[in-house]
From Swiss-Prot:
<feature type="binding site">
    <location>
        <position position="119"/>
    </location>
    <ligand>
        <name>Zn(2+)</name>
    </ligand>
</feature>
<dbReference type="InterPro" id="IPR038019">
    <property type="entry name" value="PRib_AMP_CycHydrolase_sf"/>
</dbReference>
<dbReference type="GO" id="GO:0000105">
    <property type="term" value="P:L-histidine biosynthetic process"/>
</dbReference>
<keyword id="KW-0378">Hydrolase</keyword>
<keyword id="KW-0479">Metal-binding</keyword>
<protein>
    <recommendedName>
        <fullName>Phosphoribosyl-AMP cyclohydrolase</fullName>
        <ecNumber>3.5.4.19</ecNumber>
    </recommendedName>
</protein>
<keyword id="KW-0963">Cytoplasm</keyword>
<comment type="function">
    <text>Catalyzes the hydrolysis of the adenine ring of phosphoribosyl-AMP.</text>
</comment>
<feature type="binding site">
    <location>
        <position position="94"/>
    </location>
    <ligand>
        <name>Zn(2+)</name>
    </ligand>
</feature>
<comment type="subunit">
    <text>Homodimer.</text>
</comment>
<feature type="binding site">
    <location>
        <position position="95"/>
    </location>
    <ligand>
        <name>Mg(2+)</name>
    </ligand>
</feature>
<dbReference type="GO" id="GO:0008270">
    <property type="term" value="F:zinc ion binding"/>
</dbReference>
<feature type="binding site">
    <location>
        <position position="97"/>
    </location>
    <ligand>
        <name>Mg(2+)</name>
    </ligand>
</feature>
<comment type="similarity">
    <text>Belongs to the PRA-CH family.</text>
</comment>
<dbReference type="Pfam" id="PF01502">
    <property type="entry name" value="PRA-CH"/>
</dbReference>
<feature type="binding site">
    <location>
        <position position="112"/>
    </location>
    <ligand>
        <name>Zn(2+)</name>
    </ligand>
</feature>
<dbReference type="InterPro" id="IPR026660">
    <property type="entry name" value="PRA-CH"/>
</dbReference>
Length: 134
């Protein structure tokens, strides 16, 4: 687990699980899992990673920011595509190692860089992946 320079560590298990402060438990690479969910439809749009700076920017700006492992850099979702994700609610799980971000996608409403509304556009059927929008 990596210690954040932005968010304080949990004082104890009760503070972590029941406290009012956000104290994310970043992994050894300084990342926490993030799921983006459409605020109106409930559809899961994407999975990404956040470092402490991405999480702070998301909380401060109300626009989803992530951390790209392949580019090793911050990534403001939709900055170039126009598909910004406006945050309506951010939830953190019981042990604070994953976040659920409810968003309203802007632009054409897409979230996937391949062009689909959701990154989860393939279904396993009869031994193969089949493309299918939700």
């Amino acid at each position: 687990m990596t210690v954040s320079s932005i968010f304080p560590p949990a004082a104890d298990k009760t503070a972590l699980e029941r406290g009012a402060a956000i104290m994310p438990r970043f992994d050894a690479n300084g990342l926490v899992a993030a799921i983006a969910q459409h605020a109106d439809t409930g559809e899961i749009l994407m999975f990404a990673w956040m470092n402490d700076e991405a999480l702070k920017l998301t909380l401060d700006t109300g626009i989803a920011h992530y951390f790209s492992r392949s580019r090793n850099s911050l990534w403001k979702k939709g900055e170039t595509s126009g598909q910004l994700q406006i945050v309506t609610e951010l939830r953190i799980d019981c042990d604070q190692d994953a976040v659920l971000i409810k968003v309203r996608p802007q632009g054409d409403g897409g979230a996937c860089h391949v062009g689909f509304r959701s990154c989860f556009y393939r279904v396993w059927e009869n031994g193969a992946l089949v493309e299918r929008e939700a």
